[in-house]
Regions:
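Interdomain linker/hinge connecting the two RecA-like lobes of the SF2 helicase core
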Residues: 1-75, 80-84, 88-92, 197
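Conserved RecA-like helicase motor core of SF1/SF2 enzymes
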Residues: 129-169
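Conserved helicase ATPase core of P-loop NTP-dependent helicases/translocases
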Residues: 75-79, 87-88, 94-133
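A conserved SF2-helicase RecA2
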Residues: 154-197
């Protein structure tokens, strides 16, 4: 398995950078407010909203990455944090794909995974909260090397669980996992910290 964390210059870099400029002080506030002064929910809500906007701005480039990986003969698993991003990416993709996301029945989830594993679809879009645990998306035949495109989550446990979805014992081909880190952003530091945990 190769895990690539090199920062990416996204097409909407200036908008993404502006949002990170808003995000960074909010994260610092959260660290300072661990004393329980009651403002944590407000700060957390703002951080969540900013992260959602940032992830959505990455979608056009992400769609291109998915298409490039498919053209190279890879099966692609995309892990995102927000439903809006999954929906936006789904609208941009020309190829059929399956979904693993919250609110699905066990049967629907199992069918989505089965369609991906069997090669019926070459792309699966996963919500990290729903597809990060208990889902095996590794290459079991050797016919479709896996590429995972992973939006950074700020939770180390979720991050490591997500890395384990396409890289499993018994995998028949090399896996490439690309963490979608925006260049010159706090994401670089966050992902570096999680990689060492």
């Amino acid at each position: 398995t190769r895990i690539i964390t090199d920062p990416i210059r996204f097409g909407k870099k200036s908008k993404i950078s502006a949002l990170f400029d808003e995000l960074e002080p909010e994260m610092a506030k959260l660290d300072l407010r661990r004393d329980g002064d009651g403002d944590e929910p407000i700060v957390l809500t703002k951080i969540l909203r900013l992260r959602q906007e940032i992830e959505l701005l990455k979608v056009p480039d992400l769609a291109d990455m998915v298409e490039e990986a498919r053209e190279a003969g890879n099966a692609v698993a995309v892990f995102l944090n927000f439903t809006d991003s999954i929906d936006a990416l789904s609208r941009r993709l020309k190829e059929n794909h399956s979904f693993v996301q919250g609110g699905q029945s066990k049967d629907a989830r199992d069918n989505a995974v089965s369609d991906f594993q069997s090669g019926k679809v070459g792309i699966v879009l996963c919500n990290i909260a729903a597809g990060g645990v208990g889902v095996s998306l590794h290459d079991t035949t050797g016919n479709a090397p896996r590429v995972a495109l992973i939006s950074p989550t700020y939770n180390a446990k979720d991050f490591h669980q997500t890395l384990g979805r396409v890289d499993r014992i018994g995998g028949k081909s090399e896996t490439i996992q690309r963490i979608l880190v925006a260049e010159e952003s706090i994401e670089t530091k966050i992902v570096k910290s999680m990689m060492t945990k």
